[in-house]
């Protein structure tokens, strides 16, 4: 029997697969209603801000040959409504499922306010601090690119809440290792990486960008080598748990990310091809591990053999 159980701060995962933040909304999108979320290791909810936000102009999503470009923005009803309606319903339906809430904001005070309210609700097991979303003009982008700011923000949130916090890193930086170290210095319990890579595509007939917001975040197959490289670099400087993401669409991808240094993974863009991608990946994982003669998935963490 292959062991796929992974124990991370605040998150006791029956398997290392979860949806990336935003993928399944607050557990209320059609795909999330089509299967039992208990089949996954955890549920990660959409980024929550202090007040309701409407997101970016349409079109918000462009499906590319090898990935997805999105500028959805942090559309959510605000933290109070997320707790009273969305999370209460999700927790009622899934009493034992580990739930991670994603925290966003325009200022340090925003982040602290949202984190405190989510922590105090008793409805979630861990917080993911979204310092990296490249979609919103006044949003998290600026926080995630400066090591000093990341450290300070992490410290403030850590002092304000009892829950474990995972800082979600943006790849749109000069040195990802420096930012990861800053998160660790600030007291992060773990790291999520990578968020989307800032990009743009243009329609040659109209000469207009494909997205209403012009630029957006690239995810999917195209960013996988970037994600694997960055996770590997960060794993070499920290023992913090890493939740890896960026182009995962198969159980084999999961193994590759774990070899690079991830402890668990999040699946996002693969759901555009297969709305039950995370479920299918989790189901296929034991057989893939068995093929490789692996008895415990935890034994693979960071075990890449460099040339």
Swiss-Prot record:
One of its GO terms (biological process) is 'de novo' pyrimidine nucleobase biosynthetic process. PROSITE patterns: DHODEHASE_2. Substrate binds at residues 46, 70-74, 130, 195-196. It is found in: Cytoplasm. HAMAP family: DHO_dh_type1. Pathway: Pyrimidine metabolism; UMP biosynthesis via de novo pathway. Belongs to the dihydroorotate dehydrogenase family. Type 1 subfamily. It comes from Lactobacillus delbrueckii subsp. bulgaricus (strain ATCC BAA-365 / Lb-18). Its EC number is 1.3.98.1. One of its GO terms (cellular component) is cytoplasm. This is Dihydroorotate dehydrogenase A (fumarate). Its main location: cytoplasm. It holds the Pfam family DHO_dh. Catalyzes the conversion of dihydroorotate to orotate with fumarate as the electron acceptor. GO terms for molecular function: dihydroorotate dehydrogenase (fumarate) activity. Its cofactor is FMN. The active site is at 133 (nucleophile). It is an enzyme of class 1 (oxidoreductase). It catalyses: (S)-dihydroorotate + fumarate = orotate + succinate. Binds 1 FMN per subunit.
